[in-house]
Regions:
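Short aromatic-glycine-(Arg/Gly/Cys) micro-motifs in beta-strand/loop hairpins
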Residues: 1-12, 37, 41-77
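A short, charged, amphipathic alpha-helix used as a generic interaction element across diverse proteins
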Residues: 15-37
Length: 77
């Protein structure tokens, strides 16, 4: 089952059209500050956006809000 979460798009740590690049960015960020909350790589649920974004997992919201976009979690880091 897909895990759907909501984030404010402006809070992204990194964005990329390539999953590998998003993963690399997340790993670099994690190495620099390993005490921060876990990270997630997500993909927007709407079909027109085909990129990946990296967010702090603790910032995820399970409820929709006008200023938030729905994402499907691709990987927890």
């Amino acid at each position: 089952m897909d895990e759907i979460v909501f984030f404010n798009p402006g809070d992204a740590i990194a964005n990329s059209h390539d999953f590998g690049e998003a993963l690399r960015s997340a790993q670099i960020y994690r190495t620099k500050d390993s005490l921060q909350s876990p990270l997630v790589i997500v993909k927007p649920t709407n079909d027109k956006d085909n990129g990946f974004s990296v967010y702090f997992a603790d910032d995820a919201d399970k409820n929709a809000a006008p200023d938030k976009t729905s994402y499907k979690v691709q990987k927890h880091i």
